[in-house]
Swiss-Prot record:
Protein name (Swiss-Prot/TrEMBL): Rhomboid protease GlpG
Organism listed in the record: Enterobacter sp. (strain 638)
Alphabetical GO biological process terms: proteolysis
Gene Ontology cellular component list: plasma membrane
Catalytic residues of the enzyme: S201, H254
Primary location class: membrane
Stretches that traverse the bilayer: 94-114, 142-162, 169-189, 192-212, 229-249, 250-270
Swiss-Prot/TrEMBL keywords: Cell inner membrane, Cell membrane, Hydrolase, Membrane, Protease, Serine protease, Transmembrane, Transmembrane helix
Upper classification of the organism: Bacteria, Pseudomonadati, Pseudomonadota, Gammaproteobacteria, Enterobacterales
Gene that encodes it: glpG
Length: 276
């Protein structure tokens, strides 16, 4: 057996062990003056040390909390430090993630004050020749949401996935994904239903596709989406396509966003593999 590291805080040690278990690596803990982490299969040492370095950079990452939940240690007394809500939001998101969240919330408030129609006339996808050169319209449709559930669903996913991408890969990468997916998903949805649509879900589906495929093809990037979550997203997509919810859903934007995210992840991982 090989000792990987020692933690002064047993809660942190357990979080790392739980996460590695979800990656197929079995670690054991031994409690002395500190909590030692031991690896039985020494051939996995390089991989474990690489994961440890990422863990130490941000032990509060949602993936580690999710791993503890998966492994049943949420009620063992090994809980993460509790942070105020807004501090937690800021900690796990970069500036662009927060800026777009604030913009969506502001637009939602304005829509509820002055009415949807006035805001849509100003921000919707170009609806006629007179406004086709209003460049912002090709992107601002993503800022509009039409119910509390709509905006909560999109912003939670945006914070969870967009924040991870921005923290790991930088603001530039998140901005590029957002711009391309908003533009292309909006274009396709416009062809499906006309210009009167809105929501960040096309971008969210792009992030889902990007995070999942990036994690599958380039685990070292630290970007990933659990297979259970991507399965849920696909089932939601299928249910929306067949109108199982009885709601107006931008299916064209969802499918296009997912395709954009997958394509961008494939391109990025192809370049990464060439460099190695």
């Amino acid at each position: 057996m090989l000792m990987i590291t020692s933690f002064t805080n047993p809660r942190v040690a357990q979080a790392f062990v739980d996460y590695m278990a979800t990656q197929g690596v079995v670690l054991t803990l031994q409690q002395h003056t500190q909590t030692d982490v031991w690896l039985a299969d020494e051939s996995q040492a390089e991989r474990v040390n690489a994961e440890l370095a990422r863990f130490l950079e941000n032990p509060g990452d949602p993936r580690y909390l999710a791993a503890s939940w998966t492994n049943g240690h949420m009620d063992s007394g090994l809980h993460y430090q509790r942070f105020p809500f807004f501090a937690t939001v800021r900690e796990r998101a970069g500036p662009f993630t927060l800026l777009l969240m604030a913009a969506c919330i502001l637009v939602f408030i304005i829509m509820n004050v002055v009415g949807d129609q006035r805001v849509m006339i100003a921000l919707a996808w170009p609806y006629g020749p007179a406004v086709q050169y209003d460049v912002w319209r090709y992107f601002t449709h993503a800022l509009m949401h039409f119910s509390v559930l709509h905006i909560l669903f999109n912003l939670l996913w945006w914070w969870y996935l967009g924040g991870a991408v921005e923290k790991r890969l930088g603001s530039g990468k998140l901005i590029v994904i957002t711009i391309i997916s908003a533009l292309l998903s909006g274009y396709v949805q416009h062809k499906f239903s006309g210009p009167w649509f809105g929501g960040l879900s096309g971008v969210v589906y792009a992030l889902m596709g990007y995070a999942w495929l990036r994690g599958e093809r380039d685990p070292e990037s630290g970007i990933y989406m659990q297979r259970g979550l991507i399965t849920f997203a696909l089932l939601w997509l299928i249910a929306g396509w067949f109108d199982l919810f009885g709601m107006s859903i931008a299916n064209g934007a969802h499918v296009t966003g997912l395709a954009v995210g997958l394509a961008m992840a494939f391109a990025d991982t192809l370049n990464a593999r060439k460099r190695t």
